[in-house]
Amino acid sequence: MREITYAEAIREAMSEEMRRDENVYLLGEDVGIYGGAFGVSVGMIDEFGEERVRDTPISEAVIAGAAAGSAVTGMRPIAELMFMDFSTIAMDAIVNQAAKMRYMFGGKAQVPFVLRCPAGSGTGAAAQHSQSLEAWFCH
């Protein structure tokens, strides 16, 4: 059986979906040329180009909001926040917009997007880069 890291498995899964569906794209801080904070998207910009692997400004609210907005138009974004701690900054877009939009529009709107947030990284990255807030998204 082949052994790979979580980062490699995530990269393979994202690439597989991007090959399968041209509406899937990746956006987030440093996901393009740099390959993401933990190297998960290394090389993806070479295969899929800047239109589908998009570096964003350091604004978690914009990343989540752009993902939700583009998902409603038929795109299938994979939005990466550099650390789960910063999902708190994006909660309006996640909780009040993306999570409720289908119901606010009587089932006519769909918001298919993936939000990736590395959590509890174990890198000694201090108090604002080490929380594990997964339970917030499980209910």
Functional labels for PLM-detected ranges:
Residues 1-139:
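Thiamine diphosphate
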